């Protein structure tokens, strides 16, 4: 963690207002838990002159509402950037370090240099600028909520694309997470190139494939 970063727990509305002033980038990730695909992160700098009503943790929003807010964010934010780490990078680095790398890529891709970066969770990669990790920040800080929506809609769309290529795996429904349906598909159809081979259910299936 950078010496410029701070972890904030139990943040007050007053603190949110203070640290949200100026050019602030909110950052969040989606896809740490799935067995397949990229971990996707987003960085968003909102326009204070164009407030977006209804921003919240993407997991608490319906798909229809997320998609509507996604378009509003894309149309009204000062800058939006998506960063990702591939399954190969996840296998090489581990999911935590790959997520930190993806966050760095998202911030680096912004068209405007933020004065401060606010990240959901309790860890912050080194952005080289002042940054704060805010526990449950995706439900508290508008810029982080916006980032969570961008990341979620982006990754879900990628899972829908994967579903069209491999409909027997059911990716459109479980989004690659370790559900019963996903385990059954792994057992029946095997491991795909985009599966994270360092994740135990996938590694176990590879071992079984190589045994017979």
From Swiss-Prot:
Record's GO cellular component terms: cytoplasm; ribonuclease H2 complex
Reaction equation(s) it catalyzes: Endonucleolytic cleavage to 5'-phosphomonoester
Disulfide bonds listed in the record: none
Binding site for a divalent metal cation: 28-29, 120
Gene Ontology molecular function terms on file: manganese ion binding; RNA binding; RNA-DNA hybrid ribonuclease activity
GO biological process: DNA replication, removal of RNA primer; mismatch repair
Free-text cofactor note: Manganese or magnesium. Binds 1 divalent metal ion per monomer in the absence of substrate. May bind a second metal ion after substrate binding.
One Pfam match: RNase_HII
CDD domains, per database record: RNase_HII_bacteria_HII_like
Protein's cellular compartments: Cytoplasm
Alphabetically ordered keywords of this record: Cytoplasm, Endonuclease, Hydrolase, Manganese, Metal-binding, Nuclease
Source species, domain of life: Bacteria
PROSITE patterns: RNASE_H_2
Main location class: cytoplasm
Domain RNase H type-2: from-to ranges: 22-211
InterPro entries in UniProt: RNase_HII (IPR022898), RNase_HII/HIII (IPR001352), RNase_HII/HIII_dom (IPR024567), RNaseH-like_sf (IPR012337), RNaseH_sf (IPR036397)
Necessary cofactors: Mn(2+); Mg(2+)
Broad enzyme group: hydrolase
EC number annotated for this UniProt entry: 3.1.26.4
HAMAP family the record matches: RNase_HII_B
Similarity section: Belongs to the RNase HII family.
Function per UniProt: Endonuclease that specifically degrades the RNA of RNA-DNA hybrids.
Full protein name: Ribonuclease HII
């Amino acid at each position: 963690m950078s010496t410029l970063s701070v972890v904030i727990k139990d943040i007050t509305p007053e603190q949110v207002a203070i640290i949200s002033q100026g050019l602030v980038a909110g950052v969040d990730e989606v896809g740490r838990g799935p067995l397949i695909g990229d971990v996707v992160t987003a960085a968003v700098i909102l326009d204070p002159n164009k407030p977006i009503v209804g921003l919240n943790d993407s997991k608490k929003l319906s798909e229809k509402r997320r998609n509507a807010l996604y378009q509003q964010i894309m149309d009204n934010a000062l800058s939006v950037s998506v960063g990702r780490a591939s399954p190969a990078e996840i296998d090489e680095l581990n999911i935590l370090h790959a997520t930190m790398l993806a966050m760095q890529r998202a911030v680096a891709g912004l068209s405007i240099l933020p004065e401060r970066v606010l990240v959901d969770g309790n860890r912050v990669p080194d952005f080289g600028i002042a940054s704060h990790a805010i526990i449950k920040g995706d439900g508290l800080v508008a810029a982080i909520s916006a980032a969570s929506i961008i990341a979620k809609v982006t990754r879900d769309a990628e899972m829908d694309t994967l579903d069209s290529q491999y409909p027997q795996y059911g990716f459109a429904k479980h989004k690659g997470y370790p559900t019963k349906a996903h385990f059954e598909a792994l057992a029946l159809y095997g491991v795909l190139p985009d599966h994270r081979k360092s994740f135990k259910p996938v590694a176990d299936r590879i071992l079984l494939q190589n045994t017979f």
